[in-house]
Structures are given as C-alpha cells and as structure tokens.
Amino acid sequence: MKLRWFAFLVVLLAGCSSKQDYKNPPWNAEVPVKRAMQWMPISEKAGEAWGVSPRLITAIIAIESGGNPTVVSKSGAVGLMQLKASTSGRDVYRHMGWSGEPSTSELKNPERNISMGTAYLSILEHGSLAGINDPQVMQYALVVSYANGAGALLRTFSSDRKKAIEKINDLSADEFFEHVAKNHPAPQAPRYIWKLQQALDAM
C-alpha cells in the first residue's frame, strides 16, 4: 500500500511540475524584440492591410526568428515569421487566388515574409477561429494556431468547430491558457503563449 501511495505521489508531482515546463529553458525577450522592432515599418504596413496588430506581428517575429530574415529551421520554415511554403505559404497563395507556393527566396524577403505571415494570421482569425469574442483569448488562439495549426487547438475543445468556439467563449484568457497547457498535444503550445506575453511586455 505504501509503495502504491509513493508511486501516486511521484506521478502527481511530475504532473504538477510539467505544467511549469513551458517556462524552461528560460527565454529573455529583450534582445529578440529589439531586433524584431527594426521591421516595425513593414509590420505596421502589413498590419494595416490585413487588420492585424503590429505588436502581435512583432512579437511573433521575435519568437520565431529573433528578427533574422534569412533563418531556415530544420522543418523548413523560412524567414522572419518562419513560414512553411507548403503549408501556410500555400494557404496564403490560395487565399490570394494564386497557384503554387512561395519560393525560399521570396520567404527570405522581409517585406514579403511579413506580408504573408500577417495574411496567414488574418486567414486564421476570420476563418477557423472566427467567432471568438475575447480579444486576448483570440490573440492566444491565434499564436497557438499559427505555430501548431487551428485544427489541433479546436479539437481540444470539440470535433465540431462551432461547439469548440462556444466552449472557448466560456473561458477567460487565463482559463484558456490553462486549458491549452493541460490539453494541447504540442508541449510548445503553452510556451508560445508565455513567450508572446514576454515579448509584448518587452515592447
């Protein structure tokens, strides 16, 4: 009996500590945000065109690339907002009525990258995430969906999009974050929200 109780405590403590894993390793937003701020004129232009907050765009640039326009991830995400040509890039092209997908050189162009990344945020906001009422919850939902897909997020609430949105609208921003930390299949999802807040606070 004592052994079983000890095992239960180990599992419980492990679960509690895992909720804080999103803060590890530590991330100082000051330098990435400073580098991302140099692209603010482009971010403001793109934000105005697509109805997206330039501060949100800048925060995503800080998180995704640290302001480096030429960085390419191991998974093939490119540039300031780390867009994948075959997924988010293709979605933006389709939305614009274009065929194909952006090239690597196009995605390394700061203005094109920010424009397409901002367009993708707008597509998410007015598409899969349409109907979320709370602005901060929408912001959190946007960055989680930007990083890991809207479908993965919505399925943590319901397989039915309408029901998922209704459940999201029952939550405060803090409750939404807690739900993501507990239920999202991607461990980096709550960390992204945490990084977003760090970046916004550093501006």
Swiss-Prot record:
Residues with lipid group (S-diacylglycerol cysteine): C16
Residues in the signal sequence: 1-15
Keywords (A to Z) from UniProt: Cell outer membrane, Cell wall biogenesis/degradation, Lipoprotein, Lyase, Membrane, Palmitate, Signal
Catalytic activity: Endolytic cleavage of the (1->4)-beta-glycosidic linkage between N-acetylmuramic acid (MurNAc) and N-acetylglucosamine (GlcNAc) residues in peptidoglycan with concomitant formation of a 1,6-anhydrobond in the MurNAc residue
Location of this chain's protein in the cell: Cell outer membrane
Pfam families hit by this protein: SLT
Positions of N-palmitoyl cysteine lipidation: C16
UniProt key word Iron-sulfur: no
InterPro entries: EmtA, Lysozyme-like_dom_sf, Transglyc_AS, Transglycosylase_SLT_dom_1
Gene3D superfamilies assigned to the protein according to its UniProt record, in alphabetical order: 1.10.530.10
UniProt keyword annotation of Coiled coil present: no
Source species, domain of life: Bacteria
Molecular function via GO: lytic endotransglycosylase activity
Enzyme Commission number, as recorded: 4.2.2.n2
Any one Gene Ontology cellular component term annotated for this protein: cell outer membrane
Enzyme type, top EC level: lyase
Transmembrane spans: none
Topology term for the membrane: Lipid-anchor
HAMAP family with a match to the protein in the record: EmtA
Family under the similarity heading: Belongs to the transglycosylase Slt family.
Function, as annotated: Murein-degrading enzyme. May play a role in recycling of muropeptides during cell elongation and/or cell division. Preferentially cleaves at a distance of more than two disaccharide units from the ends of the glycan chain.
UniProt name for this protein: Endo-type membrane-bound lytic murein transglycosylase A
Source species of the chain: Citrobacter koseri (strain ATCC BAA-895 / CDC 4225-83 / SGSC4696)
Gene (name only): emtA
